[in-house]
């Protein structure tokens, strides 16, 4: 979870899911504890695969606590994307005075071509697309007021326009075809 100012809460509770008959729970591991989970996106082509968005903050750079995107398939974490292995970014990466890694993924959604769109808050390229193992980044700052911070829910319509809620500044609409960005307040 996160606070009203988009700071990670990090309750470290793990995650659970119900398969129609049984509950499965992955509890927190003290050696590599979980950050605050904020959103779950199911793969439309694989009901046993989920992408879990998280907010993290830690001074231990090679742990789940950094925050990022978890890929869970058949009840196992099969991948974890953060600033070390993907374009997902640490919001403090450019500040050498802060001895912490803070990756904040507020949500994700699949489009009708199977691409996963990801909101990575607090950066210039806050919108990412993950397609067939490749990443693309988009600068959506033109759709936000200056000094705006924080993205929330992310959805896609039938025209493949990505709609992203903001913390206090309305909605951003982005369409990759023509690289169109609009801020609606």
Each predicted region: which residue ranges?
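Carboxylate-rich, polar loop motifs that coordinate divalent cations or form catalytic acidic clusters
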Residues: 1-185
């Amino acid at each position: 979870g996160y606070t009203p100012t988009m700071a990670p809460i990090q309750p470290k509770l793990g995650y659970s899911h119900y398969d129609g008959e049984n509950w499965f729970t992955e509890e927190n591991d003290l050696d590599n504890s979980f950050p605050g989970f904020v959103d779950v996106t199911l793969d439309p082509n694989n009901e046993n695969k989920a992408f879990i968005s998280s907010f993290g903050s830690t001074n231990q750079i090679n742990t789940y606590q950094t925050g990022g995107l978890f890929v869970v398939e058949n009840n196992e974490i099969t991948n974890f994307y953060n600033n070390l292995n993907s374009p997902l970014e640490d919001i403090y990466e450019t500040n050498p005075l802060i001895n912490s890694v803070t990756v904040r993924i507020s949500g994700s959604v699949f489009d009708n071509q199977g691409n996963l769109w990801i909101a990575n808050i607090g950066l210039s390229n806050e919108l990412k697309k993950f397609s067939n193992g490749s990443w693309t980044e988009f600068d959506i700052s033109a759709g936000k007021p200056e000094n705006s911070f924080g993205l929330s829910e992310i959805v896609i319509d039938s025209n493949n326009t990505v709609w992203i809620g903001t913390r206090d500044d309305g909605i951003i609409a982005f369409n990759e075809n023509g690289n169109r960005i609009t801020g609606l307040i």
